[in-house]
């Protein structure tokens, strides 16, 4: 009889009865911030509250759940096993809550308000300087917040809800995402200027000396795209992975320390200005990377991201 009565209660009554022991979004925000920063003071600053407010909110959450989530000492903040599991769940809950608000905002007016986007370092300095003024002109009410980070971190930021979309290069395994491809970006081999007379019109992978190849450090997908385009296993083993940025690699090549691979967008943006470097197209079946905008699968802002992708394509076409 009791079970039958509970089942027949209106759903809104059931929700009201749970409100006394459901964690609040604010409490989950505090917990996630503490996990991210590992320090009560820095977490409080990130949440724009006092340290005592954040600490009290997390204690209230622990009391509510009847479990210790954080072990506190003078020097160390250590999460319990349950605490770590709840942080992962809280990430998803907060992301869903943000998407709920985004859904309403997008229905009212697309590409208005805040949009957080990660851009990988081999795209950001070459595409954004020309793109952002156009975006500001076409969508003056859009408040775009940018993060520059390598592909792995960018995809992690996306799935944790720290950003809404990512501008990156494919192929790259970014998890359960939707993508709008924007354009193909050809790859060129860059040589010191004193080698120009010896170079053919196009360079095949067989003509590249692995000992001379300079690559970006691990974590940059351009390195993988360049090696895949060459399709020579010995290049992966012999290439010197030394550069932290394309600008660093350019300076190394200009000083005769080796050769490297550069994307067309970087060359068009003037990365070789004031150098003696010469470039040649790579003679390969897949001598390009594909620039794309990706977002979480099922995002309520998918239509907005497609509109954003169209703006990016128009900018490239012009």
Label each region the model flagged:
Residues 6, 24-25, 75, 81, ...:
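Interdomain hinge and pocket-entrance segments immediately C-terminal to HTH DNA-binding domains
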Residues 32-53, 74:
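Short helix-boundary/capping micro-motifs
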Residues 62-84:
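A short LG(V/I)-centered, amphipathic sequence patch enriched
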Residues 112-175, 243:
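Central regulatory/effector-binding core of bacterial HTH transcription factors
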Residues 127, 277-318:
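A late-sequence structural motif
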Residues 150-163, 168-169, 219-278:
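Hydrophobic hinge/microswitch elements
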Residues 174-213:
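Flexible hinge/capping segments at coil-to-helix
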Residues 197, 203, 212-233, 301-309:
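Secondary-structure junction motif
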């Amino acid at each position: 009889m009791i079970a039958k009565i509970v089942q027949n209660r209106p759903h809104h009554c059931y929700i009201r009865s749970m409100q006394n022991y459901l964690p609040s979004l604010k409490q989950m925000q505090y917990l996630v911030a503490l996990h991210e920063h590992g320090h009560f003071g820095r977490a409080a600053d990130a949440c724009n509250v006092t340290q005592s407010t954040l600490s009290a909110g997390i204690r209230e959450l622990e009391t509510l759940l009847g479990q210790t989530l954080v072990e506190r000492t003078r020097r160390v903040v250590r999460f319990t096993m349950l605490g770590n599991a709840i942080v992962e769940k809280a990430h998803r809950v907060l992301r869903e809550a943000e998407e709920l608000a985004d859904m309403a905002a997008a229905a009212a007016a697309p590409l208005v308000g805040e949009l957080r986007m990660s851009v990988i370092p081999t795209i950001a300095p070459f595409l954004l300087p020309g793109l952002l003024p156009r975006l500001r002109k076409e969508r003056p009410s859009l408040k775009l917040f940018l993060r520059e980070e390598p592909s792995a971190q960018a995809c992690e930021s996306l799935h944790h809800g720290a950003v809404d979309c990512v501008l990156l290069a494919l192929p790259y395994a970014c998890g359960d995402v939707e993508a709008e491809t924007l354009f193909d970006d050809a790859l060129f081999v860059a040589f010191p200027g004193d080698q120009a007379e010896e170079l053919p019109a196009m360079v095949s992978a067989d003509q590249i000396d692995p000992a001379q190849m300079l690559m970006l450090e691990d974590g940059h997908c351009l390195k993988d795209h360049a090696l895949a385009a060459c399709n020579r296993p010995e290049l992966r083993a012999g290439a010197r992975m030394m550069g932290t940025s394309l600008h660093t690699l350019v300076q190394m090549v200009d000083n005769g320390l080796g050769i490297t691979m550069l994307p067309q967008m970087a060359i068009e943006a003037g990365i070789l200005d004031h150098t003696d470097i010469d470039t040649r197209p790579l003679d390969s079946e897949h001598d390009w990377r594909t620039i794309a905008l990706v977002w979480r699968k099922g995002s309520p802002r998918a239509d907005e991201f497609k509109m954003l992708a169209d703006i990016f394509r128009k900018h490239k076409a012009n």
